[in-house]
Amino acid sequence: MISFLLLIFLIQLAIYIVNTIGSSTIDDLLWILYLRLPMPISKDTRKHGELKHDVVQLKREMNATSSQDEFAKWAKLRRRHDKAMEEYEAMNRSMGSRKTSFQFSIKIARWLTLNGPRLFIQFYYTKTPVFDLPAGWFPYPVEWILSFPRAPLGSVSIQVWSSACATAISLAGDVVIAVVQRRQASNRQAQAVPAGKSEAATK
């Protein structure tokens, strides 16, 4: 069975990844993947795209047709455009409502998957020590803080371990992001220097 140490660390890591990427970005990606599944909504998505194409095409034809010289043709295009636009707006509202419901379900599932287990473990195993501290290594105030709120004195509580994991993951993530950004900046500078030298040589 997976240990509390690793389980809590993995939960905090998953929460950090989701928060770093952004819940809205993940929701949009899952919505796109959902639309590609072989389900009735995929047919509605294709029809939605076709209606949008028809509306744009009819609008172009209307603009290319003179309402004075070719009124009959222009009026026919206008009726077709208005009808297609009405169908498109109705389907657009329907798709928007479906997307809102889908994203709401995803938010609930994400909370139950990440925060739900974390809160359950912290509440249900609040008296269970994650690991014991070496005897006599830390003074009483430090042992009391590390065992807060209800773990045995001389041990590390789940709450403290969870906070430590979250802090360590956040700091490590910041370091990785800073290193990547610095390397990207160095690469851009390295690519810009030869271009500047070549321009100077040309002059």
Curated annotation (Swiss-Prot):
Q: What is its main location?
A: endoplasmic reticulum
The reply on keyword Zinc-finger is: no
Q: Any idea which UniProt keywords this protein has? A: Coiled coil, Endoplasmic reticulum, Membrane, Transmembrane, Transmembrane helix, Transport
Q: Name one GO biological process term.
A: tail-anchored membrane protein insertion into ER membrane
Q: Which GO terms describe its molecular function?
A: protein-membrane adaptor activity
Checking InterPro entries in the record gives:
Get1, Get1_fungi, Helix_hairpin_bin_sf
User: Looking at the UniProt record for this protein, which Gene Ontology cellular component terms does it annotate, in alphabetical order?
Assistant: endoplasmic reticulum membrane; GET complex
Name one matching Pfam family: CHD5
UniProt topological domain (Lumenal) ranges: 1-4, 132-155
Q: Does the keyword Phosphoprotein apply?
A: no
Task: Name the coiled-coil region(s).
Answer: 72-97
The similarity comment for this entry is: Belongs to the WRB/GET1 family.
According to the record's subunit comment, the protein's assembly and interactions are:
Interacts with get3.
This protein is called Protein get1
Organism the protein comes from: Talaromyces marneffei (strain ATCC 18224 / CBS 334.59 / QM 7333) (Penicillium marneffei)
